[in-house]
């Protein structure tokens, strides 16, 4: 009898526990592979791959995103469409087509903003089809640098300006695997109904400027919690310039393109149409011109300039012009006075329409030199009659040139004769300008090939001063379409990305997936920088341009094992990709790109006083990026505190009942033994 009572009590306690604790036997299947604590952590805390929005600063304040304090942010995940009245901060799951309205509401509804713990953004190529347009930039990007007064003009019709605002919470763009991880954990929510659990996102996106309380560029540079935006531009001449000889210097035809772009998310900045299509067109033209016989006999000097930092105050072009004023080593062989005309290649990836590639020539001013460039473009077009290419002059009703590097040239010298070639007339045709959606699928490679073909022949016409369309040399200039297409996949896709054979033939890239955000400038700026401080794309461009514009003395080549050549007019190319590089005669140089308001001294950056003679420096925001450690996001499931309390109470109750039961059983057994 006594043993039966104890058995009944045990069964009763077990039933109580089972009714309180919602055990899911399926969990056992999930953890069969756990062999260590790290395995358990990986199962419980799922690392989410993606791209962060980071904290940027200028002289007047901050933009971008960050954890609000020095600790991690942990908040339950909820889809934006399910948001009603939030009581506590949540992680909002936002789709790309909801971004503009969401961030606009955050900026205008402070009560709503206070309930945002963090944001996960779901995007993908399918959203490009759904969206009519999405550009987080302004209607007139960088209007403060405009050489004309009408800064209210709407160049960017898809503008929302959301990337220029300050958000006091972390924002993270999910990769494809990140989207899958978040959807998987949310899909189990219905299965876990009534289990007192929440699916949360944990953001470890703390910025050093937040920790130190340095909330503008001047303060953070003083405290060393940020670095200036910038990098290294590259220029090269075809043929090489003899720096030692100043005699018989030829007029310079300068061709310009940009290599950097921006988006809401730091490392998801492809900039396919704006500006990488123009960069690839320039490289395609250089490749074509490098195969022309007698290039050394041209009447004018061809110079190619690829700029970085243009998105952040035209850092590259302003610094290049400043170095020309200083006659520094970075621009040895060039001078302001030698530049006769400038041809910039802007956005040229969306020129194809109705089987015809149409481009618009925007000129800085009316002059004989500008007309010469426009005439050369028309002659080049006519020589390519079978290619269905059309060059049109931009609408005279436009207020002036569109946002481009030429603005820096015009502000420096209003008499600059220049033309910028674009795939638009009165406003951007790129509806994803400075957006993470401006990727390879947003452009047409045939449009880029067409632009490269026109540019190559235009440059030959300008440099040779020969307007004869029947010229055999002109007809021999052909752009390699396969080369252009390969280069587009190298610079605008993660597969193969920078691991493509074309890039690896010149450098050993540190990253596979290209990121065309300017980044920060590391160490002391120099025309001969430590290559570990130079980005992959800049290093590739330097090697590629040095190779294509080079000549070799005689038929011999010399090797350079440590990246140094014995002769002053030689440079060492392909030293990264091969054990031994090759010395070639080339005028190819790095030009540091950073604000003219900054000075580097004794390992630190300082901001120089305003100089009234530098009109662009007067309006320069001086952009910096906050230092940060590794940025991580995890998702996992947590129990509600109420549930934890219930389990605690249940445990105490069961323990108490068990104790009482044991005492009762002991008493019954004692009495039974006495009776026996």
From Swiss-Prot:
Cellular component annotations (GO), alphabetically ordered: plasma membrane
One of the Pfam families matching this protein, by short name: Nicastrin
SUPFAM superfamilies per record: Zn-dependent exopeptidases
Residue ranges, Cytoplasmic side: 666-676
Membrane topology classification: Single-pass type I membrane protein
Subcellular location: Membrane
Glycosylation, residue list: 58, 336, 371, 444, 480, 555, 611
Topology, Extracellular side: 29-644
Transmembrane region(s): 645-665
InterPro entries per UniProt: Ncstrn_small (IPR041084), Nicastrin (IPR008710)
Disulfide bonds: none
Keyword Cell cycle: no
Any one Gene Ontology BP term: Notch signaling pathway
Family membership noted in the UniProt record: Belongs to the nicastrin family.
Function comment: Probable subunit of the gamma-secretase complex, an endoprotease complex that catalyzes the intramembrane cleavage of integral membrane proteins such as Notch.
Complex formation: Probable component of the gamma-secretase complex, a complex composed of a presenilin homodimer, nicastrin, APH1 and PEN2.
Protein name as annotated: Nicastrin
Protein source organism: Arabidopsis thaliana (Mouse-ear cress)
């Amino acid at each position: 009898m006594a043993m039966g009572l104890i058995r009944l009590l045990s069964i009763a306690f077990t039933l109580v526990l089972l009714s309180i604790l919602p055990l899911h036997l399926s969990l056992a299947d999930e953890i069969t592979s756990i062999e260590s604590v790290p395995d358990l952590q990986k199962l419980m805390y799922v690392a989410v791959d993606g791209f962060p929005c980071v904290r940027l600063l200028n002289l007047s304040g901050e933009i971008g995103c960050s954890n609000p304090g020095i600790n991690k942010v942990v908040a339950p995940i909820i889809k934006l469409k399910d948001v009603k009245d939030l009581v506590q901060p949540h992680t909002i799951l936002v789709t790309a087509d909801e971004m503009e309205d969401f961030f606009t509401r955050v900026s205008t509804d402070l009560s709503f903003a206070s309930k945002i713990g963090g944001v996960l953004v779901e995007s993908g190529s399918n959203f490009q089809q759904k969206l009519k347009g999405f550009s987080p930039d302004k209607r007139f990007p960088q209007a403060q640098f405009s050489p004309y007064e009408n800064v209210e003009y709407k160049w960017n019709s898809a503008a929302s300006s959301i990337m220029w605002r300050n958000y006091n919470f972390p924002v993270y763009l999910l990769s494809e695997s990140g989207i899958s991880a978040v959807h998987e954990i949310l899909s189990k929510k219905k299965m876990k109904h009534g289990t007192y659990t929440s699916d949360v996102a944990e953001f470890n996106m703390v910025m050093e400027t937040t920790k130190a309380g340095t909330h503008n560029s001047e303060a953070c540079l003083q405290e060393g919690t940020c670095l200036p935006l910038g990098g290294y531009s590259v220029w090269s001449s075809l043929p090489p310039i003899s720096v030692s000889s100043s005699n018989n210097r030829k007029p310079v035809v300068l061709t310009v393109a940009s290599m950097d772009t921006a988006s809401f998310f730091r490392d998801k900045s492809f900039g396919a149409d704006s500006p990488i299509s123009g960069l690839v067109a320039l490289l395609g033209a250089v490749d074509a011109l490098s195969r022309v016989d007698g290039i050394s006999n041209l009447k004018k000097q061809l110079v190619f300039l690829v700029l970085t930092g243009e998105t952040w105050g035209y850092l590259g072009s302003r610094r290049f012009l400043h170095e020309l004023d200083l006659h520094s080593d970075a621009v040895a062989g060039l001078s302001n006075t030698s530049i006769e005309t400038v041809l910039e290649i802007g956005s040229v990836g969306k020129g194809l329409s109705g089987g015809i590639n149409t481009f618009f020539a925007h000129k800085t001013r009316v002059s004989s030199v500008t007309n010469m460039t426009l005439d050369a473009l028309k002659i080049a077009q006519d020589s390519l009659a079978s290619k269905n290419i059309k060059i049109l002059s931009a609408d005279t009703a436009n207020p002036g040139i569109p946002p481009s590097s030429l603005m820096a040239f015009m502000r420096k010298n209003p008499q600059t004769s220049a033309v910028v070639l674009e795939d638009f007339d009165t406003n951007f045709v790129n509806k994803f300008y400075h957006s993470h959606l401006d990727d390879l699928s947003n452009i047409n490679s045939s449009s880029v090939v067409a632009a490269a073909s026109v540019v190559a022949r235009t440059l030959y016409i300008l440099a040779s001063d020969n307007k004869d369309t029947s010229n055999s040399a002109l007809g021999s200039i052909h752009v390699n379409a396969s080369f252009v297409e390969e280069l587009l996949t190298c610079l605008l896709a993660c597969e193969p990305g920078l691991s493509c054979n074309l890039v690896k033939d010149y450098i050993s890239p540190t990253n596979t997936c290209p990121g065309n955000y300017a980044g920060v400038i590391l160490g002391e700026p120099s025309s001969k920088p430590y290559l570990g401080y130079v980005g992959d794309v800049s290093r590739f461009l330097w090697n590629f341009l040095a190779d294509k514009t080079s000549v070799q003395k005689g038929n011999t080549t010399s090797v350079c094992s440590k990246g140094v050549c014995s002769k002053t007019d030689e440079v060492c190319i392909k030293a990264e990709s091969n054990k031994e590089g090759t010395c070639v005669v080339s005028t190819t140089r790095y030009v540091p790109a950073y604000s003219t308001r900054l000075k580097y001294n004794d390992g630190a950056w300082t901001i120089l006083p305003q100089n009234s003679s530098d009109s662009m420096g007067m309006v320069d925001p001086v952009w910096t990026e906050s230092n940060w450690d590794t940025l991580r996001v995890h998702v996992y499931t947590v129990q509600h505190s109420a549930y934890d309390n219930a389990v605690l109470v249940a445990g105490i109750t069961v323990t108490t009942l068990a104790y009482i039961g044991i005492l009762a059983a002991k008493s019954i057994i004692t009495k039974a033994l006495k009776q026996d």
